[in-house]
Amino acid sequence: MPFPAARDRQAIVAFDRLELQRILDLYGRMVAAGHWRDYGLSFDGEVAMFAAFRRAAERPELRIEKRPRLRLKQGAFALVSEHGAVLKRGHDLAGVLAPIERRLMRLVAG
């Protein structure tokens, strides 16, 4: 059975190495603060998603999504709450992660 041609396969959206490094660095600090315990990654043709869980048996507390189709409109990156509300959207991953960074500072300080 022949392999499907490369042009027949749909491209998969994924985080690049620097984006994933930044996300996993934040995840590690949230784990050290005792706030997150598990994560999940999902990649398909439309979106790359990182989901952070407080406990493994729950819905994700936060999702970080990369949607390249929106890069010219609102920005490719989005921070989505547990209930599906978009908390922050932007072109720069650091700006989208800023609310979590601020929460981490409060967790560590308090």
Regions found by a protein language model. Give the residues of each.
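Mixed-charge, glycine-accented linear interaction segment located at domain edges/termini
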Residues: 78-105
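Secondary-structure transition/turn motif
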Residues: 52-57, 80-84
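Short amphipathic beta-strand/extended segments with alternating polar/hydrophobic composition
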Residues: 60-68, 86-93
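Short aromatic-glycine-(Arg/Gly/Cys) micro-motifs in beta-strand/loop hairpins
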Residues: 64-84
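Short, charged, intrinsically disordered terminal tails
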Residues: 2, 6-13, 95-110
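Short, charged/polar surface micro-motifs in flexible loops or helix N-caps
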Residues: 45-48, 55-60, 70
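Short, highly charged
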Residues: 28-32, 53-55, 60
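Negatively charged, low-complexity tracts enriched in Asp/Glu with abundant Ser/Thr
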Residues: 1-49
